[in-house]
């Protein structure tokens, strides 16, 4: 299945959105990592060029977690799909609530494409907000408590039978400088990978 084509069929007007143009067997995906927002240049996204800006921070995190990867395909082959909550590049420093809301229908449909997901990682506050907006529509409450990620790290959060792991943003060169967040995000990736391996 091509994710972009599938979402275009399901959602209709996707003209101004950046959707993942990647072929996947949805049944093989056991974990989804939701990053915050698509980059301004499509080539810098996870499924852009092999040495894209987003992969330049993602690969070191996986390796720190003890998962040897070199390309996004290596991550997909391990049953892990990466996407962005907001499908349009940000126009200012912060991601606006409106841009999160505009992308929600597409993110919701995208998540529903994968029937065997056991873990969803929320990489940063925008991903957490977007996921809570989705859960509020279906369950009338937030899936993830609105407290700092640091305080949630050792809390087991389950939503519709799926383990939810709030973590830190995985893109942008700052993450390589902020050693503590890099370490914690890598530990969270390690936890996610253990959970999907244990369920095999």
Which residues does each PLM region occupy?
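Short acidic (Asp/Glu) patches
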Residues: 14-20, 57-69, 101-107
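Short hydrophobic segments within beta-strands
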Residues: 32-35, 83, 122-123, 167
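Short, solvent-exposed loop/turn segments at secondary-structure junctions
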Residues: 37-40, 87-89, 125-128, 169-172
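Active-site and ligand/interface coordination hotspots across diverse enzymes
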Residues: 1-60, 158-160, 192-200
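Short glycine-/acidic-enriched loop or helix-start segments at secondary-structure transitions
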Residues: 42-45, 131-133, 176
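Short, surface-exposed acidic-centric catalytic microdomains
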Residues: 48-98
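C-terminal capping/extension of enzyme domains
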Residues: 1-16, 91-108, 137-200
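Internal catalytic-core helix/loop-beta-alpha segment
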Residues: 77-133
């Amino acid at each position: 299945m091509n994710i972009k084509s599938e979402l275009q069929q399901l959602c209709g007007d996707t003209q101004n959105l950046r959707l993942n143009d990647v072929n996947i067997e949805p049944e093989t995906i056991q974990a989804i990592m939701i990053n915050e927002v698509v980059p301004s240049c499509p080539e810098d996204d996870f499924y852009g060029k092999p040495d894209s800006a987003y992969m330049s921070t993602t690969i070191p995190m996986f390796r720190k977690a003890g998962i040897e990867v070199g390309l996004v395909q290596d991550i997909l082959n391990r049953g892990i799909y990466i996407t962005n909550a907001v499908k349009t590049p940000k126009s200012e420093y912060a991601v606006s609530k409106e841009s999160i809301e505009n992308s929600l229908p597409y993110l919701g449909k995208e998540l529903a494409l994968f029937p065997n997901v056991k873990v969803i990682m929320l990489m940063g506050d925008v991903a957490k907000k977007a996921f809570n907006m989705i859960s509020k529509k279906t369950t009338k409450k937030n899936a993830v408590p609105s407290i700092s990620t640091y305080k949630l790290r050792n809390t087991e959060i389950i939503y519709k039978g799926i383990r939810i792991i709030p973590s830190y943003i995985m893109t942008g060169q700052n993450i390589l400088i902020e050693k503590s967040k890099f370490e914690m995000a890598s530990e969270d990736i390690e936890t996610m990978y253990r959970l999907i391996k244990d369920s095999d």
